[in-house]
């Protein structure tokens, strides 16, 4: 919800308030600590357990389904006149041959070819991943996150204010996001005699490993700073001042 609030606000108004956002589960503690989820109470937000929302789901026209229980997604998808799924890439860790048959049957069971469903791709790789299983070909659309749009008086002034040798990395410290590549980039820049500063925003399972690598390279605090978790608003301020994001 936190990534799609502006879009949800717009859909709520465009449909004359005939839009609802159904949350299957509460936001996890990690994201709440980042400041996400604050001020998200909206007249169109419901919990999946609410009886009122069950009535709306039984009389829907369009369904956009993300990380929702598959049994209920199938049930409501049959009732919808227009059915979209949205997804990030599904093969983040590759597609080993031994896992292919199981994945093929699972995703075809979730998305039978005779059901007219469309895919909203929240990654540049989503369409290609599903195409490997013969799914959603010709029925994929670009999708993404929808943060608030801020109109700056002058983009040129904003660029001029940026710190020229500052690099910002923001995300969860997970293996498939490869934050360790940033440490390697820093090491190469340092060896080349470059003057630079890298700020890393986020938390995750690789945090201690990354700090250790930065320390072993002699770059911790001097060239690389770990800023921890912060709210989306604070992240935007850092992005406004960084030369490279």
Identify what each model region corresponds to.
Residues 156-188, 199:
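Conserved donor-binding/catalytic core segment of Leloir-type glycosyltransferases
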Residues 51-71, 84-85:
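Short N-terminal targeting/anchoring amphipathic segment
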Residues 114-162, 166:
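Donor nucleotide-sugar binding/catalytic pocket of nucleotide-sugar-dependent glycosyltransferases
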Residues 91-115, 120, 149-151:
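Nucleotide-sugar donor phosphate/pyrophosphate-binding loop at the beta->alpha transition
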Residues 76-95, 120:
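Active-site proximal beta-strand in glycosyltransferases
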Residues 24-27, 170, 174, 197-210, ...:
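Glycosyltransferase donor-sugar binding loop
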Residues 47-49, 204-207, 224-238:
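Conserved active-site histidine-acidic residue motif and adjacent donor-binding/catalytic loop
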Residues 211-233, 244:
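Nucleotide-activated donor-binding/catalytic signature segment of Leloir-type glycosyltransferases, i.e.
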């Amino acid at each position: 919800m936190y990534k799609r609030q502006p879009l949800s606000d717009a859909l709520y108004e465009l449909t004359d308030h005939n839009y609802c956002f159904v949350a299957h589960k509460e936001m996890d503690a990690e994201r709440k600590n980042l400041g996400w989820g604050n001020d998200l109470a909206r007249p169109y937000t419901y919990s999946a357990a609410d009886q009122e929302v069950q009535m709306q789901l039984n009389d829907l026209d369009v369904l956009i389904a993300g990380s929702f229980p598959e049994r209920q997604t199938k049930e409501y998808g049959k009732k919808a006149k227009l059915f979209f799924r949205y997804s990030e890439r599904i093969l983040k860790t590759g597609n080993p041959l031994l896992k292919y048959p199981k994945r093929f049957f699972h995703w075809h069971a979730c998305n039978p070819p005779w059901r007219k469903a469309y895919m909203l791709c929240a990654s540049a790789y989503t369409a290609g991943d599903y195409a490997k299983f013969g799914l959603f070909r010709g029925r994929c659309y670009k999708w993404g996150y929808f943060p608030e749009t801020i109109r700056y008086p002058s983009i040129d002034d904003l660029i001029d204010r940026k710190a020229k040798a500052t690099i910002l990395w923001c995300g969860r410290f997970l293996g498939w996001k490869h934050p360790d590549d940033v440490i390697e980039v820093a090491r190469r820049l340092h060896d080349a005699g470059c003057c630079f500063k890298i700020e890393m925003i986020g938390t995750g399972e690789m945090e201690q490993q990354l700090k250790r690598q930065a320390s072993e390279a002699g770059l911790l605090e001097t060239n690389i700073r770990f800023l921890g978790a912060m709210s989306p608003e604070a992240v935007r301020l850092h992005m406004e001042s960084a030369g490279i994001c």
